[in-house]
């Protein structure tokens, strides 16, 4: 089993890359794929760049060329809700694209046209594994729930409240 780990920025993977026992580094699509061992697991870690398209390209390369069984996206995000603070961890149970807008066709905001689902569910086993790992740490709080993702940096309170309303979200990705 090979695990793919992606982050948008180098700072998000810096600590993991330092702990990795590197075997190879390959460049594909202007991204560096670091293959090796991390805490006894076979891993390919990649800084994919900012944006959902970069993340999608990276994920496809991980699946097609490295045969990863799962992909974990790590990185910074903005908390939604009064109890989430910098340094806390949010584990996604499902994800919604907040910038997908086909409301003109009668779809709810975030709905991908012609799909029977509003959100993308995360692998339950990976979610439980992440929760168990975080439960062992005491220097941060852990939350789980919906993460909303979009290709914009959100800083206004109005937009944050809107994201909380449409997505019933715990966290917003900063892509």
Name each region found by the language model.
Residues 23:
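Active-site regions of enzymes building and remodeling cell-envelope glycoconjugates
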Residues 1-20:
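Short, conserved "active-site rim" segments that organize catalytic pockets and cofactor/ligand binding
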């Amino acid at each position: 089993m090979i695990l793919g780990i992606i982050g948008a920025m180098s700072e998000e993977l810096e600590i993991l890359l330092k702990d990795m026992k590197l075997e190879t580094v390959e460049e594909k699509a202007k991204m560096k794929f670091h293959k090796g061992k991390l805490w006894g697991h076979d891993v390919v870690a990649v800084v994919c760049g900012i944006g959902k398209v970069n993340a999608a390209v990276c994920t496809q390369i991980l699946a097609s060329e490295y045969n990863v069984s799962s992909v974990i996206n790590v990185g910074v995000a903005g908390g939604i809700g009064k109890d989430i603070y910098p340094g806390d961890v949010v584990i996604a149970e499902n994800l919604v694209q907040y910038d997908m807008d086909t409301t003109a066709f009668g779809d709810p905001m975030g709905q991908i046209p012609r799909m029977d689902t509003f959100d993308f569910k995360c692998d339950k086993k990976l979610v439980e594994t992440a929760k168990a790992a975080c439960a062992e740490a005491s220097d941060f709080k852990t939350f789980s729930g919906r993460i909303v993702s979009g290709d914009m940096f959100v800083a206004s309170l109005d937009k944050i409240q809107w994201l909380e309303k449409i997505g019933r979200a715990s966290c917003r990705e900063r892509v």
